[in-house]
Structure formats: C-alpha cells, structure tokens
Amino acid sequence: MATPARAPESPPSADPALVAGPAEEAECPPPRQPQPAQNVLAAPRLRAPSSRGLGAAEFGGAAGNVEAPGETFAQRVSWGPAESPPGSFSSSSLGAPLPSRTLFPSLEGDFDSVTFASVLRASGRRACCGRAVPLPGQKIHLQIARQR
C-alpha cells in the first residue's frame, strides 16, 4: 500500500515569528545558570565576646554586652526585672532612663506600662509621620531646653 505523498514543508526561515534574527538575539541576555540554594538561616552567627564570660577568652579577654549562646536579642531584652536569668545584664545597659513621673502627672497606672502613645496623650499631642504634633485647637509653643 502506498503512502500518500506529503506536501513539502516550508523551510524554517519562511516563518518570521519562529526565526530570531541577529538583532533580536543581541537584545536577549544569555540564559541564567541555576544558582545553588542558599540557606540564610543556617549561616553561622558571629558573636562578640560576652560580658557573662562566654567566649571572652577567644577574643583576647575583651568583654562586651551580647547575647548568650542560643539567646536572641529579643529574648534578652524581653526579660523583666523580676524574671531576669542569673548573670544577665543590668538595666543600666539599656541606655538613658525614662523620664520621671512628675513630667506627666496625668499618666495613670504603673510607670512600666507607659507607652509612646500614652505620653503623647498626656502631653496633649498625637503622633503623625513619626513626630509629635499638636492636637487641633492647641497652640504651638516652641521651647528649647538646654541640659547641663
């Protein structure tokens, strides 16, 4: 049995949609090579020497106030005064103390629960764009305070 003759196929260059000319090839960047996967979470954490004596000998005895092994900054900061682990940092390492209660007499409750918003309410201001701005109807008084 004879097979029917097939129509001659047009050469591939006959269809302009299938052919990439030299100008089109120049616009396309070369194909990207696959990059090995990087596990950022598995990267080693480099630490400075600890004031708790953990690893200070490795750094020539220098001491700094850093996390203990396995402890994150958030865990270290979240410890309250009553629940601080033995050998933990003192509250003096947290920076400048909060203002005294007498600056904001309208604040109620425990001073430890004071938030930025409650201080703004007590001072008659609201937060806007990262700044304290006066509430509507409140006069603006600029004061420059010099300390020491």
Curated annotation (Swiss-Prot):
Residue segments, region Disordered: 1-66
Biased composition annotated in UniProt, kind: Low complexity: 53-66
Any further remark recorded for this protein: The adjacent MYZAP and POLR2M genes are part of a complex transcription unit. The respective transcripts derive from different promoters and are alternatively spliced. In human, some transcripts of the upstream promoter of MYZAP use exons of the downstream POLR2M gene.
Name of this chain's protein: DNA-directed RNA polymerase II subunit GRINL1A, isoforms 4/5
Native source species: Homo sapiens (Human)
Species classification: Eukaryota, Metazoa, Chordata, Craniata, Vertebrata
Gene field: POLR2M
